Amino acid sequence: MVLNSTPPASPGAEAQQRPPRYPGEDTAPTSRKEIWGWYAYGIAAEVFAVCGVGSFLPLTLEQLARERGTLLSSHLPCVGSSSPSTAPGNGTTTATLRRDGTDNDQCVVSVLGLQVNTASFAMYTFSLAVLVQALTLISFSALADYENNRKTLLLAFGFIGSMTSMLFIFIAPPVYILGSLLVVIGVTCLGSSFVVLNSFLPVLVANDPSIQTAHKEEGEELSPVNSSGEFARSEDLDEENVRDSDDHFTTGHGLKTKAAGSASPELQLSTRISSKGVGLGYCAAVLVQILSILMLFALSKTSLPKISGTLPMRFVLLLVGIWWFSFTMVSRRWLRDRPGPPLASSKGAASNSRWRIWLRLIGFAWKSLWKTVKVAVKLREVIVFLIAWFLLSDAMATVSGTAILFARTELKMSTTAVGLLSITATLSGMAGAFLWPVVSRRLRLKSNHTIMLCIALFEVIPLYGMLAYIPLFKKWGVIGLQQPWEIFPLGIVHGLVSGGLSSYCRSFFGLLIPPGSEAAFYALYAATDKGSSFIGPAIVGMLIDATGQVRSGFFFIAVLILLPIPLIWMVNAEKGRQDGLAMADILEKSHGEHASEYGGPSEEAEGLLARDI
């Protein structure tokens, strides 16, 4: 197996290396350059997440379909000289759209023989993309932990995803369906690459010289998991049998850290690196979003919008793709391979043996997730919270997609204005991550009470949009998201609430997990998140098709946001913690009963999905 040839961080670094736990493991001390290689991918991909998925991809998809669509009643083109009216907007041309709901004519496009509203087309596309992403994450979670697959998959997802963004420059309205396919591939690559990227973090931390020094000072041995230097696979979970670790759980990299509750050096370093990575990613996204707005403004002064209303946005997606590709190249150069254990195969086996092993790993990933579900069902507080998280994560994803399309179609906002809205929400989200701990501390709120407060504020968004159905406000032409400026305060609310919900839900769930089973249960947490987020957009898309208005989706969203509140209130954190500890005792008793099937590390066998947190 060929290892990365990056030199050690210092001349004496080799002396600080911990013993390898399997043939071919790279235990070279983590260098500053390698950490920046890890940061570089976050800087690369977060731009696509915010500027692409969160802003311009929904707009581009809707506009591509619109330029190919016809009005439902007259069958006239939605866009063009023969359409009843047009409204320019910084490089795009928009057909007749309602702001007050009085015009029931809608722009539809034929998809698989069905007449679909152009806004619904975008919602359905993202719903499908999230579903494919969830299936991909679960299926490839185990495979990525072996040999050089970790870095190989990271680069593959990064390069393929960036190419999908760049290829939008060639997607003209006649082939708008191909744009939908590119979105599915791009979103899948984005989510999958972040999961693989997160899997590098424990490896970087475990090999950091400061961690090894700290363990030596504490007299802790940097030893393999077992005496043979092999890893134990995660245990099979059944009605009586649940995996657990000892009082110290293994990080999956040969280091033993204290159980949850103590601030280990690994946890402190991991948190510090992760926080900086998130911050750098968001800063890069805001920077590129500003550049995109300037580009749209400049291109609106040219003849490009006359050729196609989507061309300026497609140039923005080209910029986003180039950015993603370029910084992925930096990660390719600076990140070491850090290979996992070799795939077990029989001597002299045919080449197709490797494919059989890969298929077994994919099956194992699904089997492992299902067994974790069966264990979670026995923990009442865990299952109640996961149901609430299922609904809440779906609501968050649905609001984001609906808001962008509502701003574009119902409010007739220009592409530049939508970009500014995205920047507003992103900056507010960064502020919310810091603000909510202060609010919680000042008001002396429990974690679940803070989550409920966030949800209550989140409910303001759809309720405010529904005010436009009240005749008095409808007559005024203001209040209830009837004017473009009204959506910006709600964008601030959305950002602040999303920042709080993401951090508090994750930490609150951590209180309920049996100590030592963090990887398996966070895999279930991530699968619940990814697996639910395709439902809401699909339902909103159907409502848009039925009514011809994006605003009608607010009724469903309002109910969806409210449903988790009683469930969160029902969760007893202290009881959940005690149940988790009791389950941990069962885990400890069953630890080591089953032999390793693949020869992979215990945590890594849980799958990379556990690290998408």
Swiss-Prot record:
Q: Where are the transmembrane segments?
A: 41-61, 120-140, 155-177, 189-209, 278-298, 307-327, 382-402, 418-438, 453-473, 488-510, 522-544, 553-573
Say yes or no: keyword Transport present: yes
InterPro entries, sorted:
Atg22, Atg22-like, ATG22/LtaA_families, MFS_trans_sf
Please give the residue ranges the record annotates as the region Disordered. 1-28, 80-99, 216-257, 592-613
Ordered alphabetically, the record's keywords are:
Amino-acid transport, Autophagy, Glycoprotein, Membrane, Transmembrane, Transmembrane helix, Transport, Vacuole
Q: Where in the cell is it found?
A: Vacuole membrane
Q: Name one GO cellular component term.
A: vacuolar membrane
User: Spans of biased composition, class Basic and acidic residues?
Assistant: 232-250
| Ranges of compositional bias, category Polar residues | 80-96
Which SUPFAM superfamilies does this one have? Answer: MFS general substrate transporter
- Gene3D superfamilies for this protein: MFS general substrate transporter like domains
Please verify whether the record's keywords include Translocase: no
Where's it mainly located? membrane
Protein origin, superkingdom: Eukaryota
Q: Which residues form a coiled coil?
A: none
Q: List the glycosylation sites.
A: N90, N226, N448
Q: How does it sit in the membrane?
A: Multi-pass membrane protein
GO biological process: one example: autophagy
**What does it do?**
Vacuolar effluxer which mediate the efflux of amino acids resulting from autophagic degradation. The release of autophagic amino acids allows the maintenance of protein synthesis and viability during nitrogen starvation.
Record's family? Belongs to the ATG22 family.
| Stated name of the protein | Autophagy-related protein 22-2
Identify the taxonomic lineage of the organism of origin: Eukaryota, Fungi, Dikarya, Ascomycota, Pezizomycotina
